[in-house]
Each structure stands twice: as structure tokens, then as C-alpha cells.
Amino acid sequence: MCLSALILVSLAAFTAGAGHPSSPPMVDTVQGKVLGKYISLEGFTQPVAVFLGVPFAKPPLGSLRFAPPQPAEPWSSVKNATSYPPMCFQDPVTGQIVNDLLTNRKEKIPLQFSEDCLYLNIYTPADLTKSDRLPVMVWIHGGGLVLGGASTYDGLVLSTHENVVVVVIQYRLGIWGFFSTGDEHSRGNWGHLDQVAALHWVQDNIAKFGGDPGSVTIFGESAGGESVSVLVLSPLAKNLFQRAISESGVALTAGLVKKNTRPLAEKIAVISGCKNTTSAAMVHCLRQKTEEELLGTTLKLNLFKLDLHGDSRQSHPFVPTVLDGVLLPKMPEEILAEKNFNTVPYIVGINKQEFGWILPTMMNYPPSDVKLDQMTAMSLLKKSSFLLNLPEDAIAVAIEKYLRDKDYTGRNKDQLLELIGDVVFGVPSVIVSRGHRDAGAPTYMYEFQYSPSFSSEMKPDTVVGDHGDEIYSVFGAPILRGGTSEEEINLSKMMMKFWANFARNGNPNGQGLPHWPEYDQKEGYLQIGATTQQAQKLKEKEVAFWTELLAKKQLPTEHTEL
């Protein structure tokens, strides 16, 4: 192993060198040879072969902007796959902040961004000289379909501890990934098509890395969980995976799936200085823009932000998944009702306080010490219509139910955030789980209830199970970073074991683990935290309340969420 590669990995949690083969790992993919590096986790003799920045599609530049991904071009020399690829274009400041908040690494890596970003990272503990066939776990990152990247998530611990091949993929984001004119000129969902292309690449190549293409689990968090859910529903992803895990995000998650995004396309065109007369004119003009110009448009869209002063109906904080007739032939709720989807074993979970701190902070909600009476709450929820998709008269009924204190008593802010968390995450996750169960597929649910020690110091101690908190456990942050309690290390080991057992055989249960009941008509689920135990009927009352309320007060326009 070369000295520079050693320096890269000689961090506190690693030891590089002992027990490594004499030469770095090399794999011959369909497109050409890739050279990786060996890394060992402290205390483990078996090294993991790591390949970073492996291309799975042609760079989506020029005429391939707003077009389906094309297979990567072959190469004749050996491609060096030992450094992190650039992340897909996004707001660089927010992208770096989110990376630093969510990463399981100890070290911080300065991020690079590019439109040329269709790469994946592979972590394999397999002996590449033998024909191992290990389970494959493909991670799809979150970030509201506008932020995030592969290299935030180091697969070393999960791969080492559970003897699985971990693949972390990237996909086009924001305007680049989801711009849709609603017709043949730019159907949209380019980012999801990138995810499908990455899964095809895994089918064609992962056996060379010691992975079993017949045992692929897709898992993701937030918009990554929504992406997993979309792929479960999509005919394009049939037979590309055998199991699925959605953490804090499903295809019914508010704001992330729309029937029609034409108004947003026209707004993007106008901000970019393009005429929005016809679809062809918009697409042609936007393809001429530099990536920096489109980044300027992205920043002007104020993605992920609550606009407290403008017209909320004109607000577009997401560039969402769209009903395109190809990836999504119908709206998610219709596909679920028809039971015509990929009925693979499925874990769906939420965190106890999904709208506890990180999301309201990023979206510019007032800080927790702001006094909140019912009138202020009503105003905030009206401004949140982009996220909640609630008719105005439903908001008043919901406030009556959730905000039980007429005047400010200190609890109203928490109750408002609970309301938003239920609408955006809790209720949709239960409805998707029920639909999956009713289609006859093995389904498991969890609620994560733990406050990791790696959280930002700015997060209030009262927030337990914030959005994204489970990622630290799933990717072994307590082991990789060190300096944490035995309880937190054991929680991480347990969650990795649950996830990997599920990847191995479609059932998370195993020796030495608390029993996780299947989500059947009794609706048993697992509460995961300092104490992990079975419970029943997650969010049952909330689902009943919102289902009944929205049935009575159906929106006259599109109804995309609950």
C-alpha cells in the first residue's frame, strides 16, 4: 500500500497494514479495472477493500443534462479509486453543514461539488481471490433530494462487523436531478433514474467485489428512505433488489412527490433568464447554462427554507419526485392500493421526534424559546403548506387537537413540532407499512428513541430521536469515532446486526437480539433505544385522526400526501 494511502487512513479508529495482502485490491469491472485500498478497523484482522469514486454512468453533462443516465464509457488503463468523488451540485454551504452534522467519520473532509457526480463507493470484506457471495447493502443518502452525497457515510464498520458488502451511491439533486416540464421534453426524476442505473451497475459488477447480486438490500434515510419507497413501487426497479429499508421517509412523505411540477419548472426558467414559453425552449436554454449559473438559480429558490413573509403557495422548497408515467406510472397511494409493486421484505421506521431540531432549524422555523400561542401556530402552519399540503380549515382542527393549551405554557412549540412530524413522517410511514403488509409482503416497523452523543451541541437535550439520529448507529459512528459510552456502542452493534440480518435473510431477528415482531394485523413494532422493546400500534390514533380529517376536507387541487 502506498504511503499517501496509508496517511489517509491512519486515523484513530483504523490500523492500516497488519494482515493486508501485499498489493492493493484490483477488480476488473465491465467497464475496466479499478484500483482500491485496504483498510482495517482496529481490533479486526480481516481488512476491507475500499473503492471510492467508481463511475456507474456517463457524466450527465451537455445533452445528458435532464436526460436518463447512460452506461459509463469503458476505460483501458487502471482507474485509481482511492479518493472521494465530488458530490452532486447543491448549495455548498448547507451541503457542508449537513455533511458535518450527519457523518459517522471522526475526521472532517472538505467537500467538492460537480455536475459530473455519478459515482459510488464500495466497502467489501470479501477475499477477492475467492468467489465469495456476500449480501450487498446499497445506501441511498438523504437531503430532501437537494443535498447530500455518498462520502458522508463511511461503510467500513458495517462492512467489517457484519461481513456485508456496502455500496454508497450518488444521484443528481435539485434542478439537475428533478427538473420536470411534465412532458417528453423533460419528464424529471433523473435522480431516481440514476439510482436505478446504480442498481443495474451493482447487478452487472458486484460479484467481482465478492457480493451476491441476488441478495441486494436498498436502504436509505429521509429523501433516501423516500427514494427506497419509490423504487419499491417502481416497475423500473423490479428484480434489482430483494429487500428494502426506509428510515424516516417514504413515498407518501409530504412535499417530496407531486403530480405536476410545471409551475416550478417555469419559475426555474424565469430565475435562470430563460423564456418559459414552451417546454422545448426551457430545456434548450437551461442546458446552455453553466453549472455555476444553475447553482445561482438553486440559491435563489431558497430550497429547504420556510418563507415567513411571502405567499406560501408560491414557495418551492423542494424539487420533488414527479408522476412521470415511467418511473412512477401512478401516484404512490394508487400503486399501494392496487398492490402492484415490488413486494419484497420491507423495514419502515421513524424517529421519536422527527421534527425535533435539525429540520426546523434548517428550514428557519422560529427557535424553541419563541412564545407560541394558537394564533402564531396557525400562521406558521399556513406558511408550511408546501410541506404539509393541508387545507386551511384542516389546520384549525389540527391545532385544536395538538395544541391543547390556549395560551403559551411552554408546551405549544413541542406540540406544533409533533404535529408536523406526524404529518410529514409518522402517518405516511404507517400508511405505507400497512399497504405493504396488506399486499402480503413481510413488513417490520420501528421507532428510534435515542439521543446520540454525536449530536450538535446546539440541539436541546430534550430532543430524543431527532431526524437523522439513527444514522450514527446504523453506520457504527460510536465505533469509528470512539469516545462514547458502552451503551451507545452496544446500541450501534445491535442496529447493525438487525439491519444485516435483514439483508441476509429478510428477517431482522437473530440470536442474542430483542425479538422484533413482524408488522401484521396486530401492528407490533420495535422501540429501539437505551431500552429496546416490543410495542403495538405505532401512531394508530394519529393515523386515524389525519385520515378522517383529510377525507372530510379533501383539497380541491392535487392531493399527494396522506
UniProtKB/Swiss-Prot annotation:
One Pfam family, short name: COesterase
Motif Prevents secretion from ER per record, residues: 559-562
Entry's localization field: Endoplasmic reticulum lumen; Microsome membrane
Active site, per annotation: S222, E354, H467
PROSITE patterns per the UniProt record, alphabetical: CARBOXYLESTERASE_B_1, CARBOXYLESTERASE_B_2
Reactions this protein catalyses: a carboxylic ester + H2O = an alcohol + a carboxylate + H(+); all-trans-retinyl hexadecanoate + H2O = all-trans-retinol + hexadecanoate + H(+)
Protein family per UniProt: Belongs to the type-B carboxylesterase/lipase family.
Name of protein: Carboxylesterase 1E
Gene: Ces1e
